[in-house]
Amino acid sequence: MAHSKTRTNDGKITYPPGVKEISDKISKEEMVRRLKMVVKTFMDMDQDSEEEKELYLNLALHLASDFFLKHPDKDVRLLVACCLADIFRIYAPEAPYTSPDKLKDIFMFITRQLKGLEDTKSPQFNRYFYLLENIAWVKSYNICFELEDSNEIFTQLYRTLFSVINNGHNQKVHMHMVDLMSSIICEGDTVSQELLDTVLVNLVPAHKNLNKQAYDLAKALLKRTAQAIEPYITNFFNQVLMLGKTSISDLSEHVFDLILELYNIDSHLLLSVLPQLEFKLKSNDNEERLQVVKLLAKMFGAKDSELASQNKPLWQCYLGRFNDIHVPIRLECVKFASHCLMNHPDLAKDLTEYLKVRSHDPEEAIRHDVIVSIVTAAKKDILLVNDHLLNFVRERTLDKRWRVRKEAMMGLAQIYKKYSLQSAAGKDAAKQISWVKDKLLHIYYQNSIDDRLLVERIFAQYMVPHNLETTERMKCLYYLYATLDLNAVKALNEMWKCQNLLRHQVKDLLDLIKQPKTDASVKAIFSKVMVITRNLPDPGKAQDFMKKFTQVLEDDEKIRKQLEALVSPTCSCKQAEGCVREITKKLGNPKQPTNPFLEMIKFLLERIAPVHIDTESISALIKQVNKSIDGTADDEDEGVPTDQAIRAGLELLKVLSFTHPISFHSAETFESLLACLKMDDEKVAEAALQIFKNTGSKIEEDFPHIRSALLPVLHHKSKKGPPRQAKYAIHCIHAIFSSKETQFAQIFEPLHKSLDPSNLEHLITPLVTIGHIALLAPDQFAAPLKSLVATFIVKDLLMNDRLPGKKTTKLWVPDEEVSPETMVKIQAIKMMVRWLLGMKNNHSKSGTSTLRLLTTILHSDGDLTEQGKISKPDMSRLRLAAGSAIVKLAQEPCYHEIITLEQYQLCALAINDECYQVRQVFAQKLHKGLSRLRLPLEYMAICALCAKDPVKERRAHARQCLVKNITVRREYLKQHAAVSEKLLSLLPEYVVPYTIHLLAHDPDYVKVQDIEQLKDVKECLWFVLEILMAKNENNSHAFIRKMVENIKQTKDAQGPDDTKMNEKLYTVCDVAMNIIMSKSTTYSLESPKDPVLPARFFTQPDKNFSNTKNYLPPEMKSFFTPGKPKTANVLGAVNKPLSSAGKQSQTKSSRMETVSNASSSSNPSSPGRIKGRLDSSEMDHSENEDYTMSSPLPGKKSDKREDPDLSELEKPRSRKKAPVTDPEEKLGMDDLTKLVQEQKPKGSQRGRKRGRTASDSDEQQWPEEKRHKEELLENEDEQNSPPKKGKRGRPPKPLGGGTSKEEPTMKTSKKGNKKKLVPPVVDDDEEEERQIGNTEHKSKSKQHRTSKRAQQRAESPETSAVESTQSTPQKGRGRPSKAPSPSQPPKKIRVGRSKQVATKENDSSEEMDVLQASSPVSDDTTQEGAEEEDISVGNVRRRSSKRERR
């Protein structure tokens, strides 16, 4: 070394001036004192003091002796360490110590002294700090690089520094430590794994949480040395991740935590590590993939992370894990989504597609977390989620699992409240989620009580928060109601109705409890408890809890009084909240935090507590309406036109007047309503009248000034007002005034005298008014009414056609285009019906003669006089009026008894009327009467005829009505076990004999053994039986079989001696029996009870006669294939909020696009149904399949497609499909199959007349066949000759002995049913007008397209020729048959393709738009739609030559 030359040989130690020798002979205190002086000397020296350096060299060596390095006293050691640090500074760059071992001892000694830094409160701390500062500044430890044991020294130093750092240290300490450690990494040749571990261990979460300062120190060190240390970090991860050498470090198990920390510190540290993660994401080890996914979720989702944009391959690879096979991995990905959406909105687009798939994940937890992720992001900022993401939440509100549905509904509710109610993000955001309110209320259509209760809770807490101040709450409700769509409004009205009903049930229960206990009262209480239980979740538990609650009410008078106050009509909202609080407080038990009993009672109280509406609320609502009327409301700001707001406000008040009539009892409210009566807007005045009718019972006593102001207005309205206002004015007088007889007389007399048949315009209101007076006060005007009906109504109005109708080929026109004379005739028919319903007896035989008149109208197709003056649209209206009138009268027992079977059968044919709107409205009237249990069961049999309807929408609606009516009756029987005497009129299975009888008398069923006609019969029977047989409750299959067997032992009561008629009856029985046998495995069991057959329809069974003959032709056997009926789809959809019946579709070419879940087919041989089918007729392969039956030419299948000119006759109809098909067709169908691949495995095509034997090869025939038909249609289109007049009833079958071979191709479109919401019941007239309005709206879209189609059908020479030679003549529905003229050219026999048929085609093509994206399919699709169209010709009952332009 440099100093060796000047070393004294004697080794004498020179001490600084004033310092005596330091040895073990002196005391510790003295030693410390002397060492301090030495420290001072070294501190003051610098590197340039060569003399001093030489002078004190031996002292430097002496201080490094073991005596000092191992001295027991810490103060001595500290001072020596300070000296040594200065010595390294002074003698740098060469240290005075030559021995490597000595150097190691010295540095290990200094390292040990650094532990003293830990105690910042120590008096010696400054000296420790000096020591640290000195060695850091001088980089003294760098001397150790040359030592073999350098790694041990550095590792010890790092460990020491990381262990001593704490929050007592200031920034300088931290800085010096970083300087010291970074110099070792940056200037050294290598970083050992052990040294790296001492740094990285501080990043592991457990250590990080224990010593935050050590973590910060490691972080600062890594940032400072990033470039130098990166290769060593890369090597470490490479060894662990890629080579699996976990033994190289104790930190191997924390690699993923470390990667995250290192990435957060400096992403450059991991430049070479991240690609390794991509490899790990594809590992076969589930746990390993999960760890990597968790890690990357944090890295991608971190607030300022740019990893996704910097490393796109890794991001794409990560997104792939959303579809991982391992559930926890998918779950992790979904949870990550919300952080990613919140912190990186730019990645939302990438995530959307993956979240879409996961929102349909089979795992409930994943679907649930998709909702949570999207809603969490949306609640932070609605702009973070796009419409697609919100739609995923929307879809999940219909999830099969309650937990997912609940999360989705609550999520949407919270989003709605924040952005729509509180306008947290302005109007644009509110607009973006404007659909939420409608969607949430639509869920009220679900059958599940849990869903409905949640909707009620959401409405009360999020949509119209009950804790708002009254005025604010009513304003909120007012504008909500004005902006809801029609279905949501219906749902909200239904909600209030249900709550009101439950409130009354609880009130009845309380009344029963107060009565003295008897067996009868106990039974009544139990019955009432059962009814209330059905309105609560989990009926099993609810029943027990309700029994317990009933006991509490009997025992605890205070709770009973609170509940009485709660259900009282005068209960205010504030009072209601108080009552609920008191009852729950009394029932609660502090020792039992989770109390299921209390929870159930809370559900009940929530449903019955009037938290929104009381007298004060109604008053506030009326004021809000008045503001809109005066123009002082902020309607425009709320995005509602003033007229719409006023109308909606009155509608809202009208609904509330049903559920909360007492709340309207205030002078202010009635005065405002009186002002509304005088407004020009008819709807507003109409609603005001209805409100008076519902709420005015106390006006006469309590508000005389209102009474005197109201009476003249009512008189005026009933005489001169619009018809609907006249109707409600009469009902108001009846409800409000005690002197109603006088008032009625004052109105009736002048109206009666002024009736003038020549003044048609002014006849409608008087007829309406007189009709309603007759309904409400039949005895008061019995004589004048009878003569009025006989002379004026029948002779002057109905039997007279004063003006010729407009010539038109349309079958239906809007109200404003209907001739005034027809409008008067319709009101005349209604007036007669009201008169009869008021009388409720047939003593004067008025009912009999009226029914005769109505059936004559039906028989003459609406032209009662048969003079041919009435236009076709007017005839349609009159047929509808007559059919509806019979259905209305049938609801009154005294008239039901006198309706003959012939009249009933003729009325039934209205459901197959040639005019779509007649069928639609008649079906709705029928459903309304049935669902209220007013119509006898035989009227449900009429629904079977809907199987013949060519329009899917009508079939779907009929199917839903059937399901609903069967369910209603079964529920009623469950609830009223004691009504066994009514079993014959209520048990749905008893519809089977009526259906069999009706089908045996169907005018289309002419030839007993005709295969095509029998197939029709089978379709109609299956339409009813499929739903009845869906569940084999109480062995009902055997019961139905027994019923059918019994019918075969009787005769037709309508013509017991008519052999042909009885043979038809038995043949229909055999069809039914074959369906039952093919669809049930339990039909052969013993029937639970012996069925009773209706005596009006069947004679008593002949004990001596055993009818075991099989009446079916042998060929029919092949049309019955086994398979269980599946109606789950239909059952699930009955109450779904689908588009309302008759909803107009988007383009004029489409008539009835039903964007709802596909309902099943009505085919006994149908293998099942496609769930969630695409809206395309193209998907209904099997819908067009029944023309594959009974082929006389089974061998010609392949020829058919190759020669497009083959006649229809040659098209194969055999059920047995050829196994081989063209590759070309196969291709087309494969494309098609892709679209339904999810459904196909379930075997659920919607084939109506096809068994399981119907293989794909058959489906693959259709594209070519469609092309052929399409070409024919195009050719016919060009000819475009006018259609020839046809008959009403079903399409005539041309003359000739044989059966038409084309007929099978004419019956298919009836098959594809789509679910539709059964329309809610409304006021009769109101409902009819609304229905007619809807149908008009719709018909416009159809009129234009029909003519060409009708002509096309009329002009196909090949098909007509075939028919003319092979069809059976047939009677038109509703009147005697008129045979086609022999001279008439055969090609025109098929003329009147009905409107429904033509528009069916349009419908199909509209539905096809959905599939346009996939071009290989779409061409065939539209052809398939067209073919379906063609095929359905045979199903239209009534026909007209010129309906095409309707």
Swiss-Prot record:
GO BP annotations listed: cell division; lens development in camera-type eye; mitotic sister chromatid cohesion; negative regulation of cell population proliferation; regulation of cell population proliferation
Biased composition (Basic residues): 1243-1252, 1308-1317, 1339-1351, 1436-1446
Modified residues (Phosphoserine): 1140, 1162, 1166, 1176, 1182, 1191, 1255, 1257, 1281, 1356, 1364, 1367, 1381, 1415, 1418
Biased composition (Acidic residues): 1421-1431
SUPFAM superfamilies: ARM repeat
Subcellular location: Nucleus
Highest taxon in the source lineage: Eukaryota
Coiled coil: none
Location of the DNA-binding region in this protein: 1247-1259, 1285-1297, 1370-1382
HEAT repeat residues: 383-419
Phosphoprotein is among the record's keywords: yes
Modified residues (Phosphothreonine): 1253, 1365, 1368
Ranges of compositional bias, category Low complexity: 1156-1167
Skewed-composition ranges (Polar residues): 1137-1155, 1353-1370
Assembly behavior: Interacts with the cohesin complex. Interacts with RAD21; the interaction is direct. Interacts with WAPL (via FGF motifs) or CDCA5 (via the FGF motif); the interaction is direct, cohesin-dependent and competitive.
Name of this chain's protein: Sister chromatid cohesion protein PDS5 homolog B
Organism: Mus musculus
GN (gene name): Pds5b
